[in-house]
Amino acid sequence: MFQNADEVQKYVADNDVKFIDVRFCDLPGVMQHFTIPAATFDPAEELAFDGSSIRGFQAIHESDMALRADLSTARVDPFRRDKTININFFIHDPITGEQYSRDPRNIAKKAEAYLASTGIADTAYFGPEAEFYVFDNVRFQTSANESFYHIDSEAGAWNTGAVENNRGYKVRYKGGYFPAPPVDHFADLRAEISLELDKNGLQVERQHHEVGTAGQAEINYKFNTLLAAADDLMLFKYIVKNVAWRNGKTATFMPKPIFGDNGSGMHVHQSLWQGGSPLFYDEQGYAGLSDTARYYIGGILKHAPSLLAFTNPTVNSYHRLVPGFEAPVNMVYSQRNRSAAMRIPITGSNPKAKRVEFRAPDPSSNPYLAFSALLMAGLDGVKNKIEPAEPIDKDLYELAPEEHANVQQVPTSLPAVLDALEADNEYLQAGGVFTSDLIETWIDYKRTNEIAPIQLRPHPHEFELYFDI
């Protein structure tokens, strides 16, 4: 929105802006903020904050951190009562001035710089498709003597027998793909979200009800360069959640909130360009792919077990990555084939449209880390000319057992991918994009704050299995 400090100050004065919302991303991938009066904001000055209070950042004895504005990300907040401009910031060390190695936005910025330094390409485009659910009510709690969650939706398949306010037209389990209203209860809500996205610079291409019951949705918008695409995804989540909120609903990007129905994925489309020309197209190649594209795929598939530590980084992620729910559990590539983890969309003979789609990721990921890790894996494939296994153009869910045994499968748990990341991370550290400190911090954070607490707690289903044993 702005290119320099003068533009900011002029806009603030001319448009009666009251507040500047200072935003930065924590390590797990949740946007943080604090607000200052617009009249006191100097875009050229650093702002201080306590890094020890942010997940995955600093210890208390070295907690002071500095923020520097990225003015190109400025947007007027559509949800605040008083006129407010949201600006994303980079995090720096207040003493040395160096980029903070655990700042997700800095990592994405370094990934783009590393790409240019390789000479392979100068631009990487990313187009995520983040699915989500819309609910009317959600309750959850864990304590010493109870553990439960309860979700509800007017469109939920479980509400066909509801006594009050029931006019039928519920979305069946796995039956939500494309039915027209009144079965699609949320067409107007998605339209409202789409209009808000367009106002905020995200060009919507299509929106629809997804396969799952209870309002599962997908809204696609135009791709962008790596850092900008990650910023766009954070803005997308913010708008989806807040439009749902002001309509008395609640939206979640949790990968698997409903047992027995499809989870929410985040297919990520990717392409490399050099000097304004696309690098992934070759009309002579399989599915129109160039050697560069094929090697890029080879890098992602080779490093997939460790890569998933960033693209599928939660315990809940692996409730989605199971057979039977259209999840991409087979680590192969194929054209058109949605049962493959790496799909080559049919794009005709237009070189600019040629791209690869990695279907394993989910929207619980931190997009700055996930996109950076995908790029680093792909570049490792290009640099080392890593050939993927032969493409498979048949339904991978229906393979004979002897064929299926030869197909690499996704890891089945968060502990497994963290172990893989511990063993395979050199490709991430090329050019100093990911540091060993960041990788070690990520692994420790996930093991300590997510895996261990879940392992300590009895699951409600265990009572069904074992109470009367």
UniProtKB/Swiss-Prot annotation:
| Any one of the GO BP annotations | glutamine biosynthetic process
Detail which positions bind ATP.
Answer: 205, 221-223, 269-271, 338, 343, 352
**EC number(s) from the headed UniProt entry:** 6.3.1.2
Q: How is its activity regulated?
A: The activity of this enzyme could be controlled by adenylation under conditions of abundant glutamine.
Q: What Gene Ontology molecular function terms does this protein carry?
A: ATP binding; glutamine synthetase activity; metal ion binding
The record places domain GS beta-grasp at 15-96
- Briefly, what is this protein's role? Catalyzes the ATP-dependent biosynthesis of glutamine from glutamate and ammonia.
Q: What is the designated name of this protein?
A: Glutamine synthetase
Name of the gene this protein is made from: glnA
